[in-house]
Amino acid sequence: TTSVRTLESLYHIGATLLNNPEATEEDLHVHQWQPYEMSAKAATTPAVKALQAIVAYLDKHSMETLHTSTQIIIAPGYEYKIVKAMVTNFHQPQSTLLLLVSAFVHGDWQKIYNYALAHDFRFLSYGDSSLLIP
């Protein structure tokens, strides 16, 4: 799920660069609710264009590494831009990780978790995992 947040944050960094090519690294920080406040134009940016914008930014500034940060919250209503499948374990109820999963499977998390409970799957960090493909 950390990699999911990273990949989705990269999309939003690239979309920011497409809207503001002169952005500084500080401008590229992804705020908690930024994805939900995107303009319609930015929201329809293809993932490959967003990622290409990051590569172009690095090339333009002769950089090999981009230093920025993210506070992205992925919750129901979030539209995934890069991630098409996810391998994850079964998370604790009322956690932000469960919100991320719920957003990915469009609310079907209860059906998935009920199946896991009925079949004695193990939960949390050292438990069983699942491959989710919406």
Indicate residue ranges for each PLM-predicted region.
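Surface-exposed, charge/polar-rich loops and edge strands
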Residues: T1-P134
